[in-house]
């Protein structure tokens, strides 16, 4: 049986989390001009839930101002395929994706060995194998990997480092390469909130500069930059929300590893759950 969609309201910062397993999507209810925006619409099935969340908050789903991706991997953009041609919503992607589409920048993506480093993160959220099944046929058809890049429509705008998001927003774009070349975060200084995409994940209540990366030097530079931001609310691309007085100051580095006991517990949970799913 599939795990239910996890919906968590964070009223102190005006955000609702919509998660299926590790596919975290964030609804920001006021981007600055009263209109909502969505960050990392990773699955097509998340869009109806996002619309329901907006209605529950007294907002018109048709007033959605933007859908933003922190980077172009399929698990952060696959939900774009659910948008209707007549949806009046801007799609915003990191500026580096423009170079990838033009062929002037190589397509780099972490390999299996690097991906295995975040398995402990995968175990912490309610497993929903059907979510993985939903995404699998979209691999290679949307977003990018090492060989392909494609999006359902031309983006309406690009995210530039240091720029504010549209709509008179207090959200600032932070280019954060390392996990990928286009990796991007969004920072909201008034609430000290960081939507980190895959630049920072979380495990056991602690931020973790992503150990799954294509460029270690860039990862180190990104970690140093993000540690300089006062962050009390971390909204990661994968993993659970982390709150605290100095979330990034206490973060693991990209070359740190959680305690072995925690990793083993996480892998055991995944193995048991997968076996139950296969025989359920």
What are these regions (language model features)?
Residues 261-280:
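C-terminal regulatory/interaction regions
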Residues 37-39, 68, 91, 193-195, ...:
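Residue-level marker for buried hydrophobic side chains located in beta-strands
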Residues 42-45, 144-150, 164-251, 256:
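Metallo-beta-lactamase
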Residues 11, 86-87, 230:
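Short, structured coil segments at secondary-structure junctions
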Residues 55-157:
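Active-site HxH/HxHxD metal-binding segment of metal-dependent hydrolases
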Residues 2-57, 185-202:
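Conserved beta-strand hairpin/beta-sheet module of binuclear metal-dependent hydrolase folds
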Residues 155-165:
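Short internal loop-to-helix segment that lines adenine-nucleotide cofactor pockets
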Residues 37-40, 63-69, 173-175:
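Short catalytic-loop micro-motif centered on adjacent basic/acidic residues
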């Amino acid at each position: 049986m599939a795990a239910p969609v996890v919906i968590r309201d964070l009223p102190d910062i005006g955000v609702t989390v919509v998660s299926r397993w590790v596919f975290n999507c964030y609804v920001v209810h006021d981007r600055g001009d009263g209109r909502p925006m969505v960050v990392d619409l990773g699955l097509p099935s998340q869009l109806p839930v996002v619309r329901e969340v907006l209605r529950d908050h007294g907002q018109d789903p048709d007033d959605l101002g933007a859908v933003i991706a922190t980077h172009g991997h399929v698990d952060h953009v696959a939900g774009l395929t659910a948008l209707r041609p007549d949806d009046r919503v801007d799609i915003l992607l990191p500026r580096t994706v423009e170079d990838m589409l033009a062929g002037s920048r190589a397509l780099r993506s972490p390999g299996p060995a690097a991906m295995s480093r975040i398995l402990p993160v995968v175990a912490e959220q309610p497993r929903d194998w059907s979510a993985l099944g939903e995404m699998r046929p979209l691999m290679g058809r949307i977003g990018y990997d090492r060989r392909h890049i494609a999006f359902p429509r031309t983006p309406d705008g690009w995210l530039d480092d240091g720029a504010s998001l549209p709509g008179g927003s207090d959200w600032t774009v932070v280019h954060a390469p390392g996990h990928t070349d286009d990796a991007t975060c969004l920072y909201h200084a008034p609430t000290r909130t960081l939507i980190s995409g895959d630049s920072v994940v979380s495990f056991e209540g602690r931020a973790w500069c992503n150990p799954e990366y294509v460029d270690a030097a860039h990862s180190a530079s990104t970690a140093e930059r993000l540690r300089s931001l006062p962050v009390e609310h971390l909204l990661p691309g994968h993993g659970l929300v982390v709150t605290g007085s100095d979330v990034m100051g206490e973060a693991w580095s990209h070359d740190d590893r959680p305690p072995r006991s925690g990793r083993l517990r996480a892998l055991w949970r995944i193995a048991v759950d997968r076996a139950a799913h296969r025989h359920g």
